[in-house]
Structure formats: C-alpha cells, structure tokens
C-alpha cells in the first residue's frame, strides 16, 4: 500500500482534471497524442467554453480559480483516452462511457455532445447517447448564484468505424 502523501503525489503526477492539480504537457507525455490534442484544439464549442471560464476567473467570478485548468485538463485527457481506444479497438468494437454533464459559472457544459463530437473526429461512430432518468443537480455553490438546473447523466454508445 501507499500512504496519503504518496497517493497525493501520484494523483498530482497523473491527472490535471482536478481543481488542485497542475496542468500536464500531454504531448511531452506522448507525442503520438498530437491528433487528439488537435481535435480538442479545433472543437469550437470546447474552446468557447474554455475562454468563458478563463474570463470568469479573470473577473474573480469563480468559486475556485482551478476550474478552467480542471475543465481543460478533463477534456484534453479524455480526448487522449478516446484516441487510444480508437487506436486499439478492432473495427466494429463498441466503446461505452457513462458521464454527467456539468455546470460552472452558470454555464451548462454538454459533456455528452462535446465528447461524442470529438469521438466522431477520432474514428468512432456515435450510435446512441442514452439519457438516464433523474438528472443530477448542480453544486450548492452554483445553486446559490445561478439556481438549480437538472443536468443530464448519459451513457454514450460509440462504435469503432
């Protein structure tokens, strides 16, 4: 086993999609991820969301300054996972993912749509996005400022093209 300090070190080393973690240079970790990084860079809605969150940080309107880095890290790291799945799966194989949409600074982020569009660019056909019953709510920080909004929890069904 490992102690809490070692677990924290590993988490910091491996992930950037938490508010306390530093951004990672994904291309330094694996130069073969360039097509994945390019797909995320080209996704206009994702870039608009990241720009919005950065502006909210600059205006001191976020409850945590790490949110823009965390959201960027999540989408870029997940894009690399999707890229790797497309690389190793056989033609016709299914890739299924369960995920929640999220809301930051009053802006709902349709994670299901964004990731499915990116998956389509990286070699998957989007077969279905199944919406699970009882959408989750947003955080108490969001509700206090922006009200409650039910967010979709979905199952993505993609097939390797």
Name each model feature, range by range.
Residues 1-97, 101-161:
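Class I S-adenosyl-L-methionine-dependent methyltransferase catalytic core
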